[in-house]
Amino acid sequence: MSNILRRGRLEAAQDEEILRYTSSMEADRWIFDADIAVDLAHTVMLKEQGIINREDCSKILSGLLKIREEGMEKLDFSYEDIHISLESRLIDMVGEDVGGRMHSGRSRNDEVATCIRLVLREELTGLLEEIHELRQALLTLAEKHTETLMPGFTHMQHAQPTTLAHHLCAHEAALGRDFDRIQDAYSRVNLCPLGAAAFASTGFNLNRKRTQELLGFDGLLENSMDAVSTRDFLIECASGFTNLMINLSRMAEELVIWSSSEFNFIELDDMYASTSSIMPQKKNPDTAELMRGKTGVAVGALMSLITICKGLPLSYNRDLQEATPNLWRSVETVRASVRIMEGMIKTMKVRPEVLVAQSVTGFTTATELADTFVRETGIPFRTAHQIVGMLAREMEKPTLKKIDSVAEIVLGESLSSRGLKEKMVKEALNPFSNVEIRKIAGGPAPEEMRNYLSKRQTELELNRQEIATLKDITDSAFENLLATVNEYRQA
């Protein structure tokens, strides 16, 4: 049959190159199920509002369910998008006098905006679950290592002793903020634009609240012009994905470094490694390296979305067709990265003996030694900093005698004369004592870390319940939609 969209206004058919250039059919695979759901909800509402009769409603609903069963491959890919292709298939099945009524009071503009939001909210829910599992993996590993000493780093130089638990929880805290950002974005994604039509709404007596309810949205995007033209929710989500990928790339970088011969802190499971085509001894951390590289997918998608949306006049413009494929690439990459990082964390072998041995190299206890001088002798911290800095030049383990000789140069008197004892020096140079004394909120002291881990586990359980609630709401909505569809089909 002729193209149902172009046959009235346009005489010339598009050649293959133009069709390929303008078609979104391949990208629309993401929204096939969502488009069926939107059509079902819209048709139910049309019948309830008396815009179509019961018999036509039944035929349209049955046809839509048949199309869903057949799958997208049965659609005609010569159309420019899934919406027209799906409607054309429906008309083939039930005739134009019936199928041609489905689009009453609707535009592709509000239709596609609704489809995108349906798919995106499902992706967000899945991503929230996956972030939750990764955070749980980090906390579970941290609980085993609250007393496992390791060097902390600044500028990639040994800085102060800490624990593996403290380090892992730093990553979990960042992921917790990623979780919060994405969960917050969900509230702006889960709003319904359906009923906005092209941009000026419609003269048909539609019930927008009814389609919102049938599709499980939390509310309406009320201004019809804003409803069809806004893609700020895509930019917001892509920004959240980028932030998340940047945090994952930092974790991946550490896995690469820590698994090197020079560090030897961990060994990655063979599943996440590859070897060389020429050097048979190699075990390369390729998966973690690729995760660093794939951060560019998320960053690139965000930049593309910003560029596409920048400067667009109201309301709908076809530029927006190019926006969603960028988002789908980003969310696919990000979700896979989170799942794979969870697997790497769960299966990697930690080498506590190496971590402990490295915790004192590079004079990591220098800060505590300076702090001890301040607490025990009353000298200013900046003076203590100078004394310890001069001791660090010697590259030897400081003794009270050596400390006194340097203090004589700086202060004109020894620190032992001000009350410093050899026992105090030894305590300050003990890496475990360094960690144990740091028991203020957020510090690495084992007792503080155990309290912190308990609080984080409580927060994770609350997050799990919040995810379950989101899923229950949307699952219940679709169950009700299908129940209503089946009722109207039988009628």
From Swiss-Prot:
Keywords: Amino-acid biosynthesis, Arginine biosynthesis, Cytoplasm, Lyase
Record has tRNA-binding as a keyword: no
InterPro entries the record matches: Arg_succ_lyase_C, Argininosuccinate_lyase, Fumarase/histidase_N, Fumarate_lyase_fam, Fumarate_lyase_N, L-Aspartase-like
Subcellular location per the Swiss-Prot or TrEMBL entry: Cytoplasm
Catalytic activity: 2-(N(omega)-L-arginino)succinate = fumarate + L-arginine
Gene Ontology CC annotations of this record: cytosol
GO biological process: arginine biosynthetic process via ornithine; L-arginine biosynthetic process
Metabolic or biological pathway, per its Swiss-Prot or TrEMBL entry: Amino-acid biosynthesis; L-arginine biosynthesis; L-arginine from L-ornithine and carbamoyl phosphate: step 3/3
Family matches, as Pfam families: ASL_C2, Lyase_1
GO MF annotation: an example: argininosuccinate lyase activity
Known EC number: 4.3.2.1
Family: Belongs to the lyase 1 family. Argininosuccinate lyase subfamily.
NCBIfam families: argH
Name of the protein: Argininosuccinate lyase
Source species of the chain: Methanosarcina barkeri (strain Fusaro / DSM 804)
